[in-house]
Regions:
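Auxiliary Fe-S-binding modules of radical SAM enzymes
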Residues: 1-30, 219-225
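Conserved, mostly hydrophobic/aromatic
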Residues: 12, 36, 65, 106, ...
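N-terminal pre-triad scaffold of radical SAM enzymes
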Residues: 33-74, 81-105
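Hydrophobic faces of well-ordered beta-strands that scaffold small-molecule active sites
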Residues: 48-52, 104, 136-138, 159-161, ...
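Glycine-rich, proline-tolerant flexible connector loops at the mouths of alpha/beta enzymes
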Residues: 51-54, 77-78, 104-117, 169-170
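Canonical radical SAM enzyme core domain
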Residues: 77-90, 113-158, 163-167, 181, ...
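A structural motif
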Residues: 98-101, 133, 156, 194, ...
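Conserved C-terminal portion of the radical SAM core fold
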Residues: 180-225
Length: 225
């Protein structure tokens, strides 16, 4: 079964949910890992990009995601600040560029970054692009298309928005927003030409079927990273 499904994927096919469940129950895990490695080698090779982030806004988040220390609803003793200053941001970007990092991402806490702070980030981005070859990314919550377009115009070409878990399990982990909210942001970013990276967190009590459903939704959305 493993070899048959491997060849199916290598020849351009896609496995079904039922086939994925069968693979997850395979007794010979080493054979499964080898098959996955062959698919990886053909599809993406063994090179990877390096992506560094700046925690550009920390804490004070209104959302109730159980896994996240940024939520204002939990006592985590993290440092809280509204937005980093320009010098801190530019210095860190320059340092990462000097180390050969490929991508630099602005990551902010909160359901969605405010328009005022988006404008400030855009100012930072324009200056970073003028001083380096870094590809700029952002993870700023549930932004709308017009806000994403501002980022794109400033040189931020990739947006990150994790689905975190399957649609069925997500409500166990977070009730202040939904998978549909996340998908709306992902599709808005794609519609204006942004690259999108998305994924999830493994080990929060979800089942193997939840992990498979998460992977299938990422595939449906055309996520490559």
């Amino acid at each position: 079964m493993i070899t048959q499904l491997k060849e199916k994927v290598l020849n351009g096919g896609q496995i079904t949910r039922e086939e994925a469940i069968l693979l997850s129950n395979a007794v010979d895990k080493q054979a499964l890992y080898r098959a996955a490695g062959e698919i990886r080698d053909k599809r993406v090779g063994r090179r990877f990009d390096t992506c560094s982030i700046i925690n550009a806004r920390s804490g004070r988040c209104s959302e109730n995601c159980k896994w996240c220390a940024q939520s204002a609803l939990f006592k985590t003793n993290i440092e809280e600040y509204e937005l980093v200053d320009e010098k801190t941001c530019l210095d860190l970007a320059r340092s990462n560029a000097d180390y050969g990092v490929d991508k630099f991402s602005f990551v902010t806490s909160g359901r969605a970054l405010s328009d005022k702070n988006i404008d400030r980030i855009c100012t930072f981005a324009v200056k970073i692009k003028s001083q380096s070859d870094l590809q700029l990314c952002a993870s700023m919550g549930l932004l709308k298309k017009a806000q994403l377009q501002k980022l794109m115009d400033a040189g931020i070409t990739r947006y990150h928005c994790n689905l975190e878990s399957s649609a069925d399990y997500f409500g166990t982990l977070c009730t202040s927003h939904t998978p549909a909210d996340k998908i709306e942001t992902i599709r808005a970013a794609q519609e204006i030409g942004m690259e999108v990276c998305s994924g999830g967190i493994i080990g929060m009590g979800e089942s193997m079927e939840d992990r498979i459903d998460l992977a299938l939704m990422l595939r449906e959305l055309g996520i490559k990273s």
